[in-house]
């Protein structure tokens, strides 16, 4: 389960713009998916938790994912959102790091 931050509607829009499908929603809860990755987004805000939460998503082609991320323009359209280009880290994995509007750090590899 992932916390949405202070604006649940904005969080849902962000993930939809990023390419996630909205599978279903109920008051205060939504399920989103992308390929084989699925998560529940909760209408909950806890800044300390959000700033210390990380999500990991495995993607088939990291470079293609980076191009899709750039093409989505979420980096320009959503305040506080930023990303680091594909980088090979000391632990031997290439990753894209994305900070979502709530401050959660996403690792795509």
Residue spans for each PLM region:
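Core segments of cupin and vicinal oxygen chelate
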Residues: 2-39, 45
